[in-house]
Amino acid sequence: RGLGDVYKRQPHTISEILQQSSHIQTIAKKYSHFEEYFFLGRQYMFPVSLEAALKFKEITYINGVAYPAGEMKHGPLALVDTNTIVIALCGNNHTYDKMISNIMEVVARKAHVLLIAPTGKSSYPPVQDQFLLPIYPFDELAIFPYSVVMQLFAYYIALDRGCDIDKPRHLAKSVTVE
């Protein structure tokens, strides 16, 4: 498939994700009591992890921190233990195996891991939970469905924690002062 075909399929893919929102809600309920989240991604998935961490801060009031997965060994790995939730965003490209290696590092430290990955891989790491997305031949466009999954995850955690999703505290809809 060409880039244009994949782009045109985006609404259908997002609709499929929304139909699976109860699965995302079930996972969110398991993790809503944790207070620290790490979001890991490589290449195009790193900006998605940044957006997910921001969304967590905005609507769940939980500290979410995004890291490029390859940087975990340079400090953040020291913070990982049984009280850590790691959201691993795996793209469908040459970084997949490296990402799995990063995931195994946090699994070895007994962190709770939610894997967001493409379907059809020959193997997945032994993690507590996973949400699989359709394979995208272009990771540049995979950022959209991955972002929807992360927004739903934050939404359901905020709901479970009793946060006012429609009026997040201290959040302005636009910047009005400099």
For the regions a language model picked out, list residue spans one by one.
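Short, charged/polar "capping" segments at the starts of alpha-helices
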Residues: T95-D97, G120-Y124
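Short, small-residue-biased leader/transition segments that mark boundaries at the very start
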Residues: G2-Y7
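Active-site regions of enzymes building and remodeling cell-envelope glycoconjugates
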Residues: Y124-P137
